[in-house]
Every structure is written in C-alpha cells, then in structure tokens.
Amino acid sequence: FTYLDEVHAVGLYGDNGGGVARARGLLNRIDMVEGTFGKAYGLMGGFITGRRETVDAVRSFASGFIFTTSLPPAVLAGALASVEYLKTSTIERTRAHANAALLKQSLDAQGFSYLKGESHIVPLMIGDAKCCKMLTDILLQDHDIYVQPINYPTVPRGTERMRLTATAAHTADDIRHFVNVLSFLYEQHHLPMQMRA
C-alpha cells in the first residue's frame, strides 16, 4: 500500500497542478494521495484521493474522519474554484518556481546554508531551537516577515531550521529584502553563515 503526502505539491507541480506523482507519471502506482486546500489553493481543509474502495474504507472506519466536521459549503465551493483555476493557469506555478529559484540564488550569494533540493520549500539550517525561534520572532516583530520555525519534535534536535517559501505573490524586491534582513540579523547576532547542516 503506497500512501503519498502531496500537501506541498498539489497546485504547484505538474502541467495542471496535479502534484509530483502525476507530473512524473507515477500516479498509477499510488494507492492514496493526501492533499490540502490550505497551501497552493489558499483555503483550508484537507483531502484524500484514491481508489473508490480505499476511500470508502477510510470514510467508514477512520475515526479521524468519522468524528470530524465537514467543511462548510462556501469553503468547498472556493476549493473547487481554486482547483479548477490552477488546472489551467500556469502563471502562479511558473512565478512560484521562479521565486524559489531566486530565493536560493540570493541565499547562495550571501553564503547561507540550506538543504539543496528541487522543492520550492527551502530549509534554512539553524541547528539550534532557541536561535531559530529568536530569528523568526525578530523577523515577524521587527520586519513584518513571517517565517515558520521548524524545531524538535518535527525534526531531530540539532537540525532546527527555518522553512522558507517564496510564493507567487512575492516580488523579486521582497525576496532580496528578506535575504538582506536575514544577513543583517546574522551579523547583528554574530551567527555563522554556515550553520550546521
């Protein structure tokens, strides 16, 4: 049984936003896909998709599904509209991936250590929970920049990181400003540019 978490991929990968498995032609090898309306689609709520029998089994036996409240019709209508829109529009996907590439280039130019990969999510390695929380707090309080800190138990101790995500809505100036602010904070707090990776 192959269960694939595509919450960060639906809407952003593939010709029609169908996710990584669909983009790579592997969807026929996946039994169940988990997605969310809370990221690329801009709403809330999650979903699973798969073979009818599998989805029916979840619907009938999964307590997390049985004892939850359904999404409101207005949210579902918005989700449907968003899915339909992103099936045909490539503007947002193209811009999001271009912005992710610019973010990585800007971080590289300043000497920051992040986990390299093809994803639009850029894990900026910090390696210390207190430092990670301090940086994200300062970014929000003093610079109006929200960055998600990722600490234990989500990741092992010593591998704490900031999860950076450049969206389609960000401009090149936004991205450069963020990296400049980050560089300033590292200098101000005497942090090494090459934190533990």
Tell where the protein language model's regions lie, with residue ranges.
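Conserved PLP-binding catalytic core of the aspartate aminotransferase-like
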Residues: 94-103, 108-144, 152-154, 158-159, ...
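Short glycine/serine/proline-enriched coil/turn segments at secondary-structure junctions
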Residues: 5, 40, 155-157
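Active-site cofactor/substrate anionic-group-binding motifs, chiefly glycine-
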Residues: 3-4, 151
